Regions:
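Substrate-gating cap/lid alpha-helix
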Residues: 131-167
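Intrinsically disordered, low-complexity terminal regulatory regions
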Residues: 210-290, 358-360, 364-381
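Regulatory sensory and allosteric helical modules in signal-transduction proteins
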Residues: 262, 267-268, 272-276, 283-327
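Histidine-centered active-site loop/cap adjacent to the catalytic His
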Residues: 177-213
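A short, aliphatic-rich beta-strand micro-motif
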Residues: 327-336
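Conserved SGNH/GDSL esterase-like catalytic core that processes O-acyl groups on lipids
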Residues: 15-17, 23-102
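Short beta-strand-to-loop transition segments that serve as allosteric relay/switch motifs
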Residues: 344-353
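N-terminal secretory targeting modules
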Residues: 1-17, 201-204
């Protein structure tokens, strides 16, 4: 399988987490793009017109008992929506309805507590047990009946929570002999999810001028986030290393595509900005206090500065009033494999240009290409 992520093109992206087991595992297909993450990203984008980033945290061993510990390590405040798929194991193990209700209530309350105030949670019901070939038997009928009972409880618990929605699961279509699940099954499930998710995502999407959770963070939270971000930077092992063609190629493409004098993949490291890759006559290292990237990484979306000389954040910046006389900047955050914003893919020019001329979809795609290289490097390492 490829990296546990999927993306669909667009701007103003929604960030989704799929967590659990069962349909989240992607059995039957060769990539997450063909499985539920990719299918859901495309289905949501088709409805919203926005980009979608889907992160996957799935394991066959994940259960209702292990879920709280696994979820609290994922920084849930990053996500606009969280999809949970659990229950088949509990249905087959005949977990008591009382225990299921108690533990599920605790889990979903934890999710609402640890996520942001605009995050919506979607609890996917059990796939009909006998639609799973290995359990299509009289013994499977017992688990199937219990799964229905657990789903009734799940629906009741979800109804009692303000940001949680229950979505009943459908059976996978009967596929070719010997094949368990196909890309068609994942597309169908993604459409089912997207039908329920689209409206809450639209309603919860931050309007211009609203404060993001990151902007509302208390000073101590900002410190904690910065420490986690720096650990992610250090863990990549790329600081002060030689240029690599895999990054330089993407940066050069950015420069050509946007027609700018400079382009770079920048990394914010303690009190400096260091460029892992850059094209054009631009310093490889500058103080963080002068860095446009330092502003870019404060939010998940793009930063576009049409004319730095008229922007109050940058008009006194030594790089604007002196060499190299930056006027235009566009950057998109680059995330580490663990989700911290460690730098940016950016393009810069000494001439201003209208914001409307900037292809933000392309800028995001180039930043995602850098992220893909970072993730591949982490897997190899």
């Amino acid at each position: 399988m490829d990296a546990p992520q999927a993306h669909s093109p667009g701007t103003d992206s929604d960030r989704i987490l799929i967590f659990g087991s069962g349909p989240a595992l992607g059995w039957g297909v060769l990539s997450h793009d063909l499985a539920l993450p990719g299918a859901l990203a495309r289905a949501l984008s088709a409805r919203s017109g926005r980009g979608v980033d889907v992160d996957l945290a799935a394991s066959p061993a994940t259960s209702l008992g292990t879920a709280p510990r696994e979820l609290t390590a994922l920084r849930l405040c990053r996500f606009d929506a969280i999809v949970i798929t659990l229950g088949a194991r509990d249905a087959l193990n005949l977990t008591s309805v009382r225990v299921w209700r108690r533990e599920l209530t605790a889990l979903l309350r934890l999710l609402e507590q640890e996520s942001s105030r605009t995050t919506h949670i979607f609890m996917l019901g059990n796939q009909p047990i006998r639609s799973i070939p290995v359990f299509d038997s009289l013994l499977g009928s017992v688990g199937a009946r219990h799964g229905v009972a657990l789903d009734r409880v799940t629906a009741e618990v979800c109804q009692s929570l303000p940001r949680t929605t229950f979505i009943a699961m459908t059976a996978a279509a009967r596929g070719e002999a010997g094949r368990f699940r196909s890309a068609t099954d994942y597309r169908n499930w993604a459409e089912l999810l997207a039908d329920s998710m689209a409206a809450p995502l639209d309603a919860g999407h931050l309007a211009p001028g609203d404060a993001s959770p990151a902007q509302e963070a208390a000073p101590q939270d900002v410190r904690v986030l910065e420490e986690a971000r720096q650990r992610a930077v250090d863990g990549l092992g790329i600081l002060d290393t030689d240029p690599e063609e895999r990054f330089t190629r993407i940066v050069a493409l950015a420069q050509r595509s946007f027609g700018t004098r400079w382009a770079a993949f920048t990394v914010t490291d303690h009190d400096r900005q260091w460029d892992k890759a850059n094209v054009g006559p631009f310093p490889q290292e500058i103080p963080r206090s002068r860095s446009f990237t330092d502003v870019t990484i404060r939010d998940p979306g793009p930063l576009v500065v049409a004319d730095a000389q008229t922007d109050p954040r940058f008009r006194a910046n030594p790089l604007v009033v002196g060499e190299p006389f930056i006027r235009f900047y566009a950057g998109f955050p680059v995330e580490s494999p663990s989700g911290e914003r460690i730098g940016a893919l950016c393009v810069l020019d000494p001439m201003p240009r209208p914001v409307g001329e900037i292809d933000l979809v392309l800028l995001r795609e180039l930043a995602l290409a850098v992220q893909g290289e970072l993730r591949r490097g982490a897997l190899v390492g």
